[in-house]
Amino acid sequence: MPTLHLQDVHLTRGITPVFAGLQLELTEDRIGLIGNNGAGKTSLLRLLCGLEAPDQGSIHIDGADIHQREGHLKRSQRIGMMFQNPDDQIIFPTVEEELALGLPGLKKREALQKAREFLAQRGLSDWAQRAISALSQGQRQHVCWLTLLLAGPATLLLDEPYASLDLPGQARLAHDLNRSDRQLIVSTHLLDHVRTYPRVLWLDQGQIRADGDGPDVCAAYEAHVRELIAEAAHPAKAPHLAEGSRSTETAHPAQSKAPHHG
């Protein structure tokens, strides 16, 4: 699977800094991204798939800058992204046409046939000619996932993939992800979906607050959230809680273990 490397990445939106000197090397087959809204999770995924370019620094795939010719080709062939909102991603009016979009090397008729065969294999033959506009939000999200699966990139970037799904939909997606042989980089607020991952990054206002094994990083983030809630409910205890928060950060900082990145 590809090696993704972010070197001294800076990103600003307007006057708001998103990342300042971000350094990461992403090699594990399962990587979770957690943190509050606005922490930088979606921005990181958009940088990795080339939808945004850093103001400073570089992003490489297997040693090639993704914004140079060789790296751009590698990125387009090896990285796919599923957006949080499927309406930001879907282009075509029917399911089969949307799936065929992920097969650019084939003639239209061949691509549509492969899309129909793929849907049939998954018991969804009746979806082929369904109008996207007739699908629920969760069903449209499932179409985006199926399009990625059929296209077959080596690395899948998933931004809040469970957000629009009902419980059966979440179970189906989790089953697919568990069986996948691709590299998965998953941003989520549902920590149980990444808790067992070999690597989880906790982002906080564009900084890597913690970087390590899934169980440890998820537990540290949950403890931090509990402290924030308790502090809001009992302001008089804030000094004690602030001290506890500092001890949590010390136990799980981004540099607290042999780093995964250079």
Description of each model-found segment:
Residues 49:
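Helix-to-loop junction immediately C-terminal to a conserved catalytic motif
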Residues 156-160:
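Catalytic Walker B motif of ABC-type/P-loop ATPase nucleotide-binding domains
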Residues 4, 18-21:
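Conserved structural motif at the start of ABC-family nucleotide-binding domains
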Residues 109-127:
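Conserved ABC ATPase "signature" region
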Residues 207-230:
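Conserved beta-strand-loop-alpha-helix hinge in the C-terminal portion
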Residues 65-80, 105:
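ABC ATPase NBD coupling module
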Residues 131-135:
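Conserved ABC ATPase signature
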